[in-house]
């Protein structure tokens, strides 16, 4: 249940509008279609629809249609009788039967083959199905909630998705905004995930993010949305370790080699200015930038930063005071 709460954090108007729409839809015993990119929390919205409905005491069953081939998907959704195919040694109740009295959530619906789509339509219209290898219709009472990021109307035009099924599923459509359109929620969730990770790895507290880290989090596009944000924050907190200084290094790509701590970008430190100039002012600015760079590469450990500049701790502290850093 913790992850359910994690992904439903948010104050952005677009997200609050979704929650309000879900609250209105939940009591209605109608199919719902959820549209959203990967990592936006489609299953969690489906779960919310279930637990705010009169079916909340019934089962909430989910299935990713993209995870199975046509035959396995058919069997997993509708069940099969013993001997229906090679290896079917006993009767297997499908997801619809297991969701009887509750809600069935089908993710990646657009990947379902036409044969399965036809059977889904029959369940929606008549509330009945037949197991694979069976001949007796079974009555089921299930609310169907489906999700995809595909353009289903375009697929209908291409002939790869049934128009009548889309008509029945789209009683109402919930469109989840991507994280990049919820900028005000990024830091809210990042801080929450960071605190949770600190608890998981037994750290006493989370020291917060530096301004540079905040800019990194806010400027990134987040193609993986909330799921990616959670992974990135947890990874960064773990790598940050037990330092009491604010987290500065946001590790978005774990495969990218980190530069040595003592590496200094030549382009940033050795480029010569154009003349004429105020030499003292230039020296002051260079000194300040080197202090900031040493703090960054020393993970905001002032003793380590002083060592990087060949200074004593007290000399380094005096320079920080001089430049009001």
Swiss-Prot record:
Its main location: cytoplasm. It is found in: Cytoplasm. ATP binds at residues 36-43, 99-108. ATPase activity is inhibited by interaction with PspA. Under inducing conditions, the interaction is disrupted, allowing activation of psp transcription. One of its GO terms (molecular function) is identical protein binding. GO terms for cellular component: cytoplasm; protein-DNA complex; transcription regulator complex. The keyword Cytoplasm applies. Residues 15-237 form the Sigma-54 factor interaction domain. GO terms for biological process: negative regulation of DNA-templated transcription; phosphorelay signal transduction system; positive regulation of DNA-templated transcription; regulation of cellular response to stress; regulation of DNA-templated transcription. It holds the Pfam family HTH_8. It comes from Escherichia coli (strain K12). Residues 302-321 bind DNA. This is Psp operon transcriptional activator. Forms a complex with PspA, which is composed of around 6 PspF subunits and 6 PspA subunits. PANTHER family: PSP OPERON TRANSCRIPTIONAL ACTIVATOR, TRANSCRIPTIONAL REGULATORY PROTEIN. Transmembrane segments: none annotated. Transcriptional activator for the phage shock protein (psp) operon (pspABCDE) and pspG gene. The keyword DNA-binding applies. Keywords: Activator, ATP-binding, Cytoplasm, DNA-binding, Nucleotide-binding, Transcription, Transcription regulation, Two-component regulatory system. InterPro entries: AAA+_ATPase, Homeodomain-like_sf, HTH_Fis, P-loop_NTPase, Sigma_54_int, Sigma_54_int_dom_ATP-bd_2, Sigma_54_int_dom_CS, Transcription_activator_PspF.
